[in-house]
Amino acid sequence: MNNDNDDSIEIIGGVDPRTMATRGEDESRDSDEPSLTDLVEQPAKVMRIGTMIKQLLEEVRAAPLDEASRNQLREIHATSIRELEDGLAPELREELDRLTLPFNESTAPSNAELRIAQAQLVGWLEGLFHGIQTALFAQQMAARAQLEQMRHSALPPGMGKPGQAGGQGTGQYL
């Protein structure tokens, strides 16, 4: 979704936050496309699991693990993904399924395989969190723009914005 004046920014999946602020609240409510904040059904759960996964990645990086530890981390990784999926809408579940590959069940994963899998999951979660922050910011900007528009339309004739001279008014002035 590139425009001629897009400054080489491409928005992948979702609404461009630069245009979100110019849309009215009614228009965004009528949209068939759910917002990113609606796609995370249990945000607290997703945040807790994301924090845990990030900490596990730090542990995997810090020291070499024996076979039993690697097997346990493989199970934790699979359980974490299942738990994450419970907190996500179907669209995000499908995306997560496409991006995560299961470990080989017959052998313990190597330290490198664990690091890659954990880093991939942490990166996906951080992207999700940044997307949510962007969506919330865009919603705030849209609400602010709508409030300013309401304030401006509520001013009596002849009154301008604060700091501006009054416009063309009706009636006589003393």
Swiss-Prot record:
It comes from the Bacteria. Residues 160-174 have a biased composition (Gly residues). One of its GO terms (biological process) is regulation of proteasomal protein catabolic process. A motif (HbYX motif) lies at residues 172-174. Keywords: Proteasome. Signal peptide: none annotated. GO terms for cellular component: proteasome complex. Residues 1-37, 153-174 are annotated as: Disordered. Forms a homooligomeric, either hexameric or heptameric, ring-like structure which stacks co-axially with the proteasomal alpha-rings. Interacts with the core proteasome alpha-subunit (PrcA) through its C-terminal hydrophobic-tyrosine-X motif (HbYX motif). Interaction of Bpa with the proteasome stimulates proteasomal peptidase and casein degradation activity, which suggests Bpa could play a role in the removal of non-native or damaged proteins by influencing the conformation of the proteasome complex upon interaction. Belongs to the Bpa family. This is Bacterial proteasome activator. The gene is bpa.
